[in-house]
Each structure stands twice: as structure tokens, then as C-alpha cells.
């Protein structure tokens, strides 16, 4: 099977790269093993929240300039501030065109409220998510009886420290009892599958309506809206106060929705989606990828003009830690890591951990190297890249988006030259 590009990995980076390549008229396939890290995320995307020295970032342009001085090998630093901002804006446009209506400004971070009621700097958020400063003084944090993925009293306690009048309440929906037989089934995603049925909407409205008359804003867990935000908008039009949603413990409704919106758009535009499959071997000839062998297509290789590695980091098995060191399991690419295992981590758990910055070695075009030699038609994007800490620096989503579009532009340019 011949393709212009085969992308190994169906997470945020892989999907955005595929969508951008489709804009250039290239035929793409995505090989994906299972759920991506988006299923376990908040659904919000960070661009740059903090510098390596711990300094928080609000002005993104100034933050990118400072980042280049502190971390010259960071993926952003390799591109330059203006290029990062341009690609981030393009990514935001691409997300919105795919149906993921995320709001934010590439120049200025905003503060979203987290499930614990604290604030986190971010780039893009769903319209349901409450953003600081809140537009209300009287707030009620509402939990769902029996839902362990969200603790209303913890969020309320944090918000009260910000001089807000915050109460808590709990709604009990007997219609959800079918899920209570097994506590592991009473999760936000399973609740959403029931509540998203239009016939159930009035039940949720009836439960929230008495609470809404006594406050200016309701904050509740995101336990509906797997496909879109229609129910949230329907409730907001009818309730006498604003309704906002907080992501829950994983799996996350908002994260799954974002992934599904991008995946559906990729398929609608003619992309080949290969779920439940896994790349087992990649054949390289003369420094280029010539064939990609997958588990489900055992004796039928995929033959791409270009290949993209978007396999993620340790969480997605894009990187594997062994006693002897860190390795990239698909091609055995060169990996940036510390010399000894003892240097992988810091003693204090909440300190920035060196292993977070491990990843494949690439040139400035994000082409990785194998035994010191650049693989000419292979690009690495997203969390598999080296040189950044997605947790401490708050840049995971941004690196995925920016590197994906940068690689897509490179491929499109080279594909045009080869025609």
C-alpha cells in the first residue's frame, strides 16, 4: 500500500500533522495502537506556562525569547519565537476547523480553574471550562452522588481562598443507578454516554434548576458532552445562572471529545485510520524509510514517500526505559539521555525530573538520526522529542501542535519538489 505519508501514532501530534498534510492534498495513513494520551488529559492545551528556571510565563513572546536563552535545545528554541507563534495560530485555526472550538490567545496565556479549584496557566480551553477571573461571586460547586472522579468540597475549599462565596451541593440522578452496580463503571465517561441522550436532558435540568436559583454560577464535573457541547449550551440557555464544567480524573470527557473530533475530521477528509494496529518494523534503505510493517498487515508493507514518528513518550511506549538506558523501540533511533541511570531523576518528587526531557535526537527540521545519520524522509514530532519538560514547563500540547505543523510544512514542500 502506497501513501504520501504514514504517521506512526494517532495522538494530538499525529492527527494535527495528518490534518495539515491533507490541506496540501497529500494522501495520509495513521497507524495507532489504542487510546492516546488525550483520553487522559484535561482537554486544554498548554503553549508555555513556565521557564526552566521556574519563572511563570504570561507574555508568550517574551517567554519564548527567554526560553531560547535558557534552553537552546528546546523544540521551540530551534524554531524561534515568531515561527512558534505562527504555527500555534495555524494549529488553533486547524482545531477550530475540525469542530474543536477551543478558545485562547497565542500571545497571552489565561488561567483556567482546575478540578481542585486551583489555577493553571494554559493556551487553549473549551468554552465550558471556567477561566479566571470568574464572572460571578456566588458560586456553587455541584457534585454527582456516587461519582468518585470529582470532589466538590476540595474545589470549593480552594476557591474560597480567593475571596469568593462558594457553596457545595450534590445532585442525585436515579437514572444513573444502572451504572452503580459496579463502582468502576460509575465514571464520568460512562455517565456522559447516558446523559448525552436528548431524552435525558430534562432530567439534568430539573436537578440543577433549584440550585441555579440561589447562585450566579454552577461549577460541576464534565460528565456529559462526549460528542459536542450541545447539552452544555442547551442548559446554559435555560438555567438562570452560568454553568461551567471541570475535567475529572482520567479518562476525561473533554479530552476524549477533542481526540474524537480530530479523528473524525481526518477520516472525513479521506485519511486512512488504522486503529488497533501497531508498527512492528521499519525498513530503511540508503538512509530513508522505504517500508513500514504493521501487526495487522503482516506481509503487506506500507510504502510511504515520507514517514512521521508521533509515538509519544513513556506513557504511550514511544520511549522505553530499560536497565541499560532509554531506547526508541520502533527504529532504535538515537535518544538524548543522561550518561547514568542515577541522573534520570531528582530526589524530590515535585522537582523537575531529568527523564522528562529524554527523547529522540533530531536536526532543526525534526528529522531524527539513526546511529548518527539523519533519516532523510522521517520526521519525529510531539512527546517523543527531546529537550523539553511538558510538566514543569507547561508546554506539552504546544510542542505537539507546533512540531506537527512544522513537519507537515516540510513534507508538503519536499513532496511538491519531488513531483
Swiss-Prot record:
Residues of the signal peptide: none
Keywords: Flavoprotein, FMN, Oxidoreductase
Broad class of enzyme this protein falls into: oxidoreductase
Listed pathway(s): Polyol metabolism; glycerol degradation via glycerol kinase pathway; glycerone phosphate from sn-glycerol 3-phosphate (anaerobic route): step 1/1
Superkingdom, taxonomy of origin: Bacteria
Annotated GO biological process: glycerol catabolic process
CC terms in the record's Gene Ontology section: glycerol-3-phosphate dehydrogenase (FAD) complex
Function per UniProt: Conversion of glycerol 3-phosphate to dihydroxyacetone. Uses fumarate or nitrate as electron acceptor.
Subunit note: Composed of a catalytic GlpA/B dimer and of membrane bound GlpC.
Protein name: Anaerobic glycerol-3-phosphate dehydrogenase subunit B
Amino acid at each position: 500500500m502506497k501513501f504520501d505519508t504514514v504517521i506512526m501514532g494517532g495522538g494530538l501530534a499525529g492527527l494535527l500533522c495528518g490534518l495539515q498534510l491533507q490541506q496540501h492534498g497529500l494522501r495520509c495513513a495513521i497507524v495507532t495502537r489504542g487510546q492516546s494520551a488525550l483520553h487522559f488529559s484535561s482537554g486544554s492545551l498548554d503553549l508555555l506556562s513556565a521557564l526552566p528556571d521556574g519563572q511563570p510565563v504570561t507574555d508568550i513572546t517574551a517567554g519564548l525569547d527567554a526560553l531560547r536563552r535558557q534552553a537552546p535545545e528546546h523544540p521551540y528554541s530551534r524554531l524561534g519565537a515568531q515561527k512558534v507563534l505562527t504555527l500555534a495560530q495555524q494549529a488553533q485555526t486547524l482545531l477550530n476547523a475540525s469542530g474543536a472550538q477551543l478558545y485562547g490567545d497565542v500571545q497571552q496565556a489565561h488561567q483556567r480553574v482546575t478540578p481542585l479549584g486551583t489555577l493553571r496557566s494554559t493556551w487553549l480551553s473549551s468554552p465550558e471550562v471556567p477561566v479566571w477571573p470568574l464572572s460571578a461571586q456566588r458560586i456553587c460547586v455541584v457534585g454527582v452522588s456516587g461519582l468518585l472522579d470529582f470532589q466538590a468540597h476540595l474545589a470549593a475549599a480552594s476557591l474560597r481562598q480567593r475571596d469568593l462565596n462558594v457553596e457545595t451541593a450534590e445532585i442525585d440522578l436515579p437514572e444513573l443507578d444502572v451504572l452503580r452496580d459496579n463502582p468502576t463503571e460509575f465514571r464520568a465517561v460512562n455517565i456522559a454516554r447516558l446523559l448525552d441522550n436528548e431524552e435525558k436532558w430534562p432530567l439534568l435540568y430539573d436537578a440543577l434548576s433549584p440550585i441555579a436559583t440561589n447562585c450566579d454560577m454552577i461549577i460541576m464535573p464534565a460528565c456529559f458532552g462526549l460528542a459536542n457541547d450541545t447539552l452544555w449550551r442547551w442548559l446554559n440557555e435555560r438555567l438562570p445562572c452560568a454553568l461551567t464544567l471541570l475535567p475529572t480524573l482520567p479518562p476525561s470527557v473533554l479530552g476524549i471529545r477533542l481526540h474524537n473530533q480530530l479523528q473524525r475530521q481526518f477520516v472525513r477528509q479521506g485519511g486512512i485510520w488504522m486503529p488497533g494496529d501497531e508498527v512492528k518494523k521499519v525498513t530503511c534503505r540508503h538512509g530513508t524509510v522505504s517500508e513500514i510493517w504493521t501487526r495487522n498487515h503482516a506481509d503487506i508493507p506500507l510504502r510511504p514517500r515520507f514517514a512521521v514518528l508521533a509515538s509519544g513518550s513513556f506513557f504511550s511506549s514511544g520511549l522505553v526505559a530499560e536497565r541499560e538506558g532509554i531506547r526508541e523501540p520502533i527504529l532504535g533511533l538515537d535518544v538524548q539521555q543522561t550518561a547514568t541511570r542515577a541522573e534520570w531523576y531528582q530526589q524530590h518528587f515535585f522537582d523537575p525530573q531529568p527523564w522528562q526531557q529524554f527523547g529522540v535526537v533530531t536536526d532543526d527540521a525534526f528529522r531524527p538520526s539513526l546511529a548518527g545519520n539523519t533519516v532523510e524522509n522521517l520526521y519525529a514530532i510531539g512527546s517523543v522529542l527531546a529537550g523539553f519538560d511538558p510538566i514543569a514547563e507547561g508546554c506539552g500540547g504546544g510542542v505537539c501542535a507546533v512540531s506537527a505543523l512544522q513537519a507537515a510544512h516540510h513534507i508538503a514542500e519536499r513532496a511538491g519538489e519531488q513531483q
